[in-house]
Regions:
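Detector for glycine-centered tight turns/loop "hinges" at secondary-structure junctions
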Residues: 27, 71-72
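Active-site loop of classical SDR/Rossmann-like NAD(P)-dependent oxidoreductases
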Residues: 56, 77-90, 106
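Loop/helix-junction capping segments adjacent to catalytic residues or to phosphate/diphosphate-binding pockets
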Residues: 14, 41, 86, 105, ...
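Tryptophan-centric aromatic hotspots in well-structured domains and transmembrane helices
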Residues: 59-60, 85-87, 121-122
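C-terminal helix-rich "cap/oligomerization" subdomain common to oxidoreductases
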Residues: 25, 91-128
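Contiguous beta-strand/loop segments that form the cofactor/metal-binding neighborhood of enzyme cores
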Residues: 1-61, 90-99
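Short polybasic amphipathic segments
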Residues: 45, 62-71
């Protein structure tokens, strides 16, 4: 990520609505919004590309999505087993059982990179 912008709304010194744009070295951009001031938000997610988009209900645990590709649309629905943290709990259990110190799906470096990006967004937001 070469550039970060955040059009944040603050209340009592706390960011309550963030509109973050990330710019990458190749010129591609990513945008996301997160808020605690919008009770009507359905917590939906959209991924928009040059040839189409994916729209989903609850972005953090979608059970349905609509894929729009070059003018065609297809919907997919899937039931999920367990609660919101089932896969995380299963991964920890597997790691303990088999003495794995790092998950295959997300390495320690992935975690460090993610935290680093969040810290950079925080610096842009709060100027610290």
């Amino acid at each position: 990520v070469t550039h970060i912008e955040n059009d944040a709304t603050f209340k009592n010194g706390i960011d309550i609505h963030d509109k973050v744009t990330l710019t990458f070295a190749n010129g591609a951009t990513a945008y996301f919004e997160c808020a605690i001031d919008d009770l009507q938000n359905k917590r939906s997610g959209k991924i928009i590309g040059t040839k189409g988009s994916i729209e989903m209900d609850y972005f953090y645990r979608p059970t349905s999505a609509t894929v729009n590709y070059e003018g065609e649309s297809q919907s997919v629905t899937r039931e999920l087993d367990g609660d919101d943290f089932y896969s995380e709990i299963a991964a920890v259990h597997h790691g303990i059982s088999y003495i794995n110190y790092e998950a295959k799906r997300m390495s320690h470096q992935d975690t460090i990179d993610e935290v680093s990006l969040l810290e950079r967004i925080h610096e842009v937001t709060y100027g610290k």
